[in-house]
Amino acid sequence: MKLTCVMIVAVLFLTAWTFVTADSIRALEDLFAKAPDEMENSGASPLNERDCRPVGQYCGIPYEHNWRCCSQLCAIICVS
């Protein structure tokens, strides 16, 4: 009985939350519609840059094309 009441309250809360946030979503719809080449400063996106480690730092399991190393070559430490 308690679980049923909790589930009903949770569903009502999530439904109300959806309706409350729906108005604010309409104001932001243009932000996601733009392609990266249409944006003013698409090069400044943090997703365009990877945080790589310089030569001599620990990189983990050794293998070629390791994204952790700037040189993409890992032998427990990044090598050039």
From Swiss-Prot:
The record's section on InterPro entries has: Conotoxin, Conotoxin_omega-typ_CS
One GO cellular-component annotation of the UniProt record comes to:
extracellular region
The record's GO molecular-function terms, alphabetically, read: calcium channel regulator activity; ion channel inhibitor activity; toxin activity
Task: Give the intrachain disulfide bonds.
Answer: C52-C70, C59-C74, C69-C78
Q: Where is it localised? A: Secreted
Q: What is its main location?
A: secreted
Q: Does the keyword Disulfide bond apply?
A: yes
Q: Which Pfam families match?
A: Conotoxin (PF02950)
Tissue expression as described in the entry: Expressed by the venom duct.
In the UniProt record, the signal sequence range is: 1-22
Query: Which UniProt keyword terms apply here?
Result: Calcium channel impairing toxin, Disulfide bond, Ion channel impairing toxin, Knottin, Neurotoxin, Presynaptic neurotoxin, Secreted, Signal, Toxin, Voltage-gated calcium channel impairing toxin
This protein's domain notes:
The presence of a 'disulfide through disulfide knot' structurally defines this protein as a knottin.
Query: What family is reported?
Result: Belongs to the conotoxin O1 superfamily.
**Biological function:** Omega-conotoxins act at presynaptic membranes, they bind and block voltage-gated calcium channels (Cav).
Q: What is this protein called?
A: Omega-conotoxin-like PuIA
